[in-house]
């Protein structure tokens, strides 16, 4: 079932309300959000979209491409946990990853800069390096 992204087809104010003249259009349809979750492996789904193109959705994520701004290098590292999600506090508890989510990786804390449900990949920028524990 599709999600309707059009307007309500009626005049909000002014004058007598009459039956609407517009009909719903297929190009107003949307889809449910992906809700990319943290898992032990990556799971991607290919979805056909308008125009015959394909969109890759990341359903489950284990790895992220993290850029270290100090050294200007990128590495594919494992995601350890979801720390915080400014978009919705409940997302962090449910381990849902969206753009802006702060994740804990093997390198340290990073903020997600890509849209996993739209791009099919998690890109992030390192904001706090992980402190090394002294051995002994």
UniProtKB/Swiss-Prot annotation:
GO cellular component, one term: ribosome
Domain of life: Archaea
Sequence segments annotated as region (Disordered): 1-23
An annotated Gene Ontology molecular function: structural constituent of ribosome
Keyword match Membrane: no
Keyword Transcription regulation recorded: no
Compositional bias annotation for Basic residues: 13-23
Biological processes annotated in GO: translation
This protein's UniProt keywords: Ribonucleoprotein, Ribosomal protein
Family statement: Belongs to the eukaryotic ribosomal protein eS8 family.
Quaternary structure and interacting proteins, as annotated: Part of the 30S ribosomal subunit.
Protein name: Small ribosomal subunit protein eS8
Organism of origin: Hyperthermus butylicus (strain DSM 5456 / JCM 9403 / PLM1-5)
Gene that encodes it: rps8e
